[in-house]
Swiss-Prot record:
Residues 353-372, 442-454 have a biased composition (Acidic residues). Residues 4-111 form the HTH TFE/IIEalpha-type domain. This is Transcription factor efuD. The keyword ATP-binding does not apply. Gene3D superfamilies: Zinc/RING finger domain, C3HC4 (zinc finger). One of its GO terms (biological process) is transcription initiation at RNA polymerase II promoter. Residues 327-454 are annotated as: Disordered. It comes from the Eukaryota. Pfam families: TFIIE_alpha. Transcription factor; part of the gene cluster that mediates the biosynthesis of enfumafungin, a glycosylated fernene-type triterpenoid with potent antifungal activity, mediated by its interaction with beta-1,3-glucan synthase and the fungal cell wall. Is possibly responsible for the transcription regulation of one or more genes within the gene cluster. Keywords: Initiation factor, Nucleus, Protein biosynthesis, Transcription, Transcription regulation. Belongs to the TFIIE alpha subunit family.
Length: 454
């Protein structure tokens, strides 16, 4: 018999009821059965069968697979639209549970249960008191070696604290060994032997497809024939219903050396290498003789290796410096173009600000226009003075004129009489009189402005 199948059947007989044993035996003989056929073999209802199978499934001894089936010759299910025509066609499927023995899963479950049972029995039978190593044959007192360490005879034997008699080692019967653990090992010796045999052999995989290929049909007879069914291989899954992709993920790995894409200063690199060389340098008491001070063979070898490393690093340093110069040249050109563009932008902005300021000043000049005030020097033809009667000049004074848009303004109009033969003395006296008249008239104008009628 197959050792895996034998282990499952013996385990069922050791820990389960008769109904569970019959289910295991039926599956071991027929390889796989659905719930209807298994209920027919055992002569029980589906409800009771599913209760028994549920415990075996929970313990991992049997496995369950659901498979879609349809009756042979059954018409497809159609749905009618508003016009009475069929709109969709679906197959009438029903899913049936098939039971089989998955050897690998059952063996792992049995090993786990055995381990848990051994731990439980060991914890229950563990002694609650400390184990005694020595016993007195006279007074039957028991001691540990630590308790009688201070009472030793000249011969090197441990002595009893009560009667000072030599102590004897405790026998195996007096150590309080766990009897339950012994009994469990004796009862499970057959199962343990089969598990050891399984560990040394190769157990074949028995999944549902393999079990179905080795299935042995049952004989129902003519009085209770089985229904003819068709197997539907396509089974709805998460990938098909949710539209998920089941293709394996592709992983790409890129390996980069230390320093790839990182700009390192050559001086910093040189200092780092020099520091590492000093750390790796041999001490002087090894590289040089402590007596004569001459370099030893080990020191000479180290010096040669250091020289070769320096030569190699020097070549690398030259290449790094050339590459660094190239990078710096490119960076300098980019920076020069950037600063030139920035300077042009600043000049354009300054010129724009200056133009705006000039426009604002022009607007201010337009708003506050200068008004010229008439004076004797500015307007010699029209002098705002009161005319003075002279023998040669007649003056007409036009007094205040009222402006329609503003306050009353004092205006004077002097009309010179045209005469022939005016003397210079008369002109001088006329100018003096005009000046006095102007001063008096300006005072009157200020008074009128201060006390203006509203």
């Amino acid at each position: 018999m197959d050792p895996a199948k034998e282990l499952i059947r013996i385990t069922a007989r050791a820990f389960y009821s008769t109904e569970h044993v019959l289910i295991i035996d039926a599956l071991a003989i027929h390889s796989t059965l659905n719930d209807i056929d298994l209920a027919h073999i055992l002569g029980m209802q589906l409800k009771g069968l599913r209760r028994l199978v549920g415990r075996l499934k929970e313990d991992g001894l049997i496995s369950v697979e659901s498979r879609g089936e349809k009756k042979e010759g059954a018409p497809p299910m159609t749905t009618l639209g508003k016009d009475g025509q069929p709109t969709s066609i679906k197959e009438r499927l029903f899913y049936r549970d098939w039971y089989y023995l998955n050897y690998h899963r059952a063996i792992d479950s049995i090993k786990y249960r055995m381990m848990k049972l051994s731990k439980y029995i060991e914890s229950q039978g563990a002694p609650t008191t400390e184990k005694k190593d020595l016993v007195c044959p006279r007074c039957k007192s028991q001691y540990t070696e630590l308790e009688v360490m201070d009472n030793i005879s000249p011969m090197g034997d441990f002595l009893c604290h009560m009667c000072q008699h030599s102590l004897d080692p405790a026998t195996e019967d007096d150590t309080g060994e766990n009897e339950n653990m012994k009994r469990l090992n004796d009862q499970l010796s057959r199962i343990v032997d089969i598990m050891r045999n399984i560990d040394s052999t190769d157990v074949p995989e028995n999944d549902f497809d393999t079990a179905l290929s080795h299935a042995l049909p049952i004989d129902r007879g003519s009085s209770n024939p089985a229904r003819r069914i068709e197997i539907v291989e396509s089974k709805p899954s998460i990938a098909s219903t949710k539209g998920l992709s089941t293709a394996p993920d592709q992983i790409s790995v890129s390996v980069m050396e230390d320093g790839d894409g990182v700009k390192i200063d050559p001086e910093e690199l040189a200092r780092r290498r020099e520091k590492e060389a000093k750390q790796n340098m041999l001490p002087e008491w090894i590289s040089k003789s402590t007596i004569s001070g001459d370099i030893t063979s080990v020191g000479a070898k180290e010096a040669a290796e250091r020289a070769s490393r320096d030569a190699h690093n020097m070549g690398l340093r030259v290449e790094d410096v050339a590459e660094d110069k190239k990078l710096r040249t490119d960076d300098d050109g980019a920076m020069d173009s950037y600063w030139a563009a920035l300077k042009a932008e600043q000049e354009r902005q300054a010129q724009q600000d200056q133009d705006e300021e000039e426009e604002e000043e022009d607007d201010d000049d337009d708003e506050f226009e200068d008004v010229d005030v008439g004076t004797a020097s500015a307007q010699p033809a029209s002098v705002p003075a009161i005319s003075v009667s002279t023998p040669a000049t007649s003056a007409q004074v036009s007094s205040t004129a009222t402006d329609e848009d503003g306050p009353a303004a004092k205006r004077t109009k002097v009309t010179e009489a045209q005469s022939n033969g005016t003397a210079p003395a008369a002109a001088a006296s006329s100018q003096a009189a005009a000046a006095e008249s102007k001063n008096g008239e300006s005072d009157e104008d200020e008074d009128e402005l201060e006390f203006e009628d509203i």
